[in-house]
């Protein structure tokens, strides 16, 4: 986890690059560097679960901490276990990992019986990797904007880790509506957000912090949605007020996953 002082310096550098329209190339270069370091020090091609390990370059696109193969695997398992603990999983006949990337969480449904496993992502290379190496799952490409390539009420569970955290406010509203469409009545939508834990680490300017504390969504680098550069910070009340139309809010866990994201659990109304 980046310390507040270091984050402040990183934010200043990113802001400077953003003014020059160079922030996205800078982030990509940073990711390439992390991947190269991981590859240089060597790593296996298969994990302890017997499934292939995605290449370091793919993992760093999911998040810089995932250059570490162990963290990639352990955090994915933790999130899968977290999902199981939040919903009545024995009632889930079909689940969708929206924004599955290269299968960080998806891979941990390998041994599940009685549940059809689906995933989708905007990155075609990651989708191809999942379909080749995670044969128990059916993974499809989606665009940055809805719709998803699925029919109405197909899934009992849709979950999204580190997806809403990288979308503009407009896109978030559209995607919540789309997730509601593909859920069965009574189905659950579980997703992560950046909350008070991240704000408390001086991720925001004083003005941005005041806006967050007033209950407003704060989105940094909103012009780069769908990338790790774009970062959205959600007050808990904002989610209940603006993102739960047609849902009941049935669960909330602050700083609950290995990335210290807040976890929200919504249930679709009949």
Residue ranges, per PLM feature:
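A short SAM/SAH-binding and catalytic strip from SAM-dependent methyltransferases
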Residues: 157-170
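Conserved beta-strand/loop positions that form the S-adenosyl-L-methionine
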Residues: 98
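Surface-exposed loop/turn positions
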Residues: 93, 152-154, 187
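Class I (Rossmann-like) S-adenosyl-L-methionine-dependent methyltransferase catalytic domain
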Residues: 2-94, 102-147, 169, 174, ...
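A short acidic, Gly/Pro-enriched loop at the edge of an enzyme's catalytic core
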Residues: 147-158
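A short glycine-rich, Lys/Arg-flanked "PGG" loop and its adjoining helix->strand segment in the class I
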Residues: 173-185
């Amino acid at each position: 986890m980046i310390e507040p002082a270091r984050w402040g310096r990183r934010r200043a550098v990113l802001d400077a690059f953003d003014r020059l329209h160079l922030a996205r190339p800078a982030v990509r270069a940073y990711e390439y560097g992390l991947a190269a370091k991981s590859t240089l020090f060597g790593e296996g091609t298969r994990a302890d679960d017997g499934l292939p390990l995605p290449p370091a370059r793919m993992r760093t696109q999911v998040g810089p901490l995932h250059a570490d193969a162990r963290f990639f695997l352990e955090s994915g398992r933790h999130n899968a276990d977290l999902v199981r603990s939040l919903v009545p999983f024995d009632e889930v006949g079909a689940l969708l990992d929206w924004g599955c990337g290269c299968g960080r969480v998806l891979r941990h449904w390998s041994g599940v019986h009685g549940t059809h496993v689906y995933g989708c992502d905007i990155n075609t290379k990651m989708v191809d990797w999942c379909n080749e190496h995670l044969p128990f799952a059916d993974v499809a490409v989606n665009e940055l904007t809805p719709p998803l390539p699925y029919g109405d009420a197909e899934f009992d569970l849709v979950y999204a880790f580190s997806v809403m955290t990288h979308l503009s406010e407009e896109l978030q509203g559209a995607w919540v509506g789309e997730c509601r469409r593909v859920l069965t009545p009574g189905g659950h939508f579980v997703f992560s957000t950046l909350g008070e834990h991240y704000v408390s680490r001086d991720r925001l300017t004083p003005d941005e912090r005041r806006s967050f504390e007033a209950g407003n969504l704060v989105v940094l680098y909103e012009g780069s949605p769908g990338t790790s550069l774009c970062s959205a910070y959600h007050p808990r009340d904002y989610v209940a007020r603006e993102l739960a139309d047609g849902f009941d809010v049935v669960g909330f866990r602050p700083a609950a996953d290995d990335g210290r994201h807040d976890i929200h659990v919504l249930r679709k109304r009949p």
